[in-house]
């Protein structure tokens, strides 16, 4: 199974493909899509979409994971980031890939064990997990690989049970609740 992780951005979008089959994570491909230096935001969105469609067609991933935008102080920046995420998701959806979303804290915790890890710590763990110490990844690329690994970790530990809240857990597991 190949997982495509994407770290969307309005200036650069990182992507990373990993294959977690067999318990060892293998690096398939990774890079950063540098977007044209233009003020025309729709053109950048098309570049993200087109580049990711090319990556999907070239590598045939089975699943797609993307980082959710974090809340910031600048509403315009948040809108641009959300649109970049949407362009990435549309590339996956138009190729019939299932889409998963993760917060930055979820990704960091999954890869480093610390939801507040620095970019340097994330990069170190990516190189270690993927046995890629001879490679240095740009931050956007390392983040995308971390997103793919996070998704792989989630799949590996998914027991099939999903709950929408405490009430649904109690309904599904009455024997595990004591009064």
Curated annotation (Swiss-Prot):
Q: Name one GO cellular component term.
A: cytoplasm
Q: What keywords appear on the UniProt entry?
A: Cytoplasm, DNA damage, DNA recombination, DNA repair, DNA-binding, Endonuclease, Hydrolase, Magnesium, Metal-binding, Nuclease
From the UniProt record, which GO molecular function terms apply?
A: crossover junction DNA endonuclease activity; DNA binding; magnesium ion binding
What does the cofactor field's note say?
A: Binds 2 Mg(2+) ion per subunit.
Broad EC category: hydrolase
Q: What is its EC number?
A: 3.1.21.10
Task: Provide the residue positions that the database annotates as binding Mg(2+) 1.
Answer: 7, 140
Do you know which CDD domains this protein is assigned to?
Answer: RuvC (cd16962)
Which sequence ranges are marked TM in the entry?
none
The record, for Pfam families, names:
RuvC
Q: Which residues form the active site?
A: 7, 67, 140
Q: How does it assemble?
A: Homodimer which binds Holliday junction (HJ) DNA. The HJ becomes 2-fold symmetrical on binding to RuvC with unstacked arms; it has a different conformation from HJ DNA in complex with RuvA. In the full resolvosome a probable DNA-RuvA(4)-RuvB(12)-RuvC(2) complex forms which resolves the HJ.
Q: Which family does the similarity line name?
A: Belongs to the RuvC family.
Q: What does this protein do?
A: The RuvA-RuvB-RuvC complex processes Holliday junction (HJ) DNA during genetic recombination and DNA repair. Endonuclease that resolves HJ intermediates. Cleaves cruciform DNA by making single-stranded nicks across the HJ at symmetrical positions within the homologous arms, yielding a 5'-phosphate and a 3'-hydroxyl group; requires a central core of homology in the junction. The consensus cleavage sequence is 5'-(A/T)TT(C/G)-3'. Cleavage occurs on the 3'-side of the TT dinucleotide at the point of strand exchange.
Name of the protein described by the UniProt record = Crossover junction endodeoxyribonuclease RuvC
């Amino acid at each position: 199974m190949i997982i495509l992780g994407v770290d969307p951005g309005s200036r650069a979008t990182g992507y990373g493909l990993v294959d977690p089959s067999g318990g060892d994570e293998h690096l398939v491909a990774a890079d950063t899509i540098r977007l044209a230096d233009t003020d025309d935001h729709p053109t950048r969105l098309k570049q993200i979409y087109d580049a990711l469609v090319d990556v999907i067609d070239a590598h045939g991933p089975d699943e797609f994971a993307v980082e959710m935008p974090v809340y910031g102080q600048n509403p315009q920046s948040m809108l641009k980031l959300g649109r970049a995420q949407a362009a990435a998701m549309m590339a996956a959806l138009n190729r019939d890939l299932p889409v998963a979303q993760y917060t930055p804290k979820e990704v960091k915790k999954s890869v480093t064990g610390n939801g507040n890890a620095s970019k340097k710590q994330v990069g170190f763990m990516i190189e270690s997990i993927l046995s890629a110490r001879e490679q240095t990844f740009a931050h956007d690329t390392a983040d995308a690989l971390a997103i793919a690994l996070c998704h792989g970790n989630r799949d590996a530990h998914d027991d099939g049970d999903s709950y929408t809240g405490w009430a649904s857990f109690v309904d599904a597991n009455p024997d595990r609740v004591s009064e």
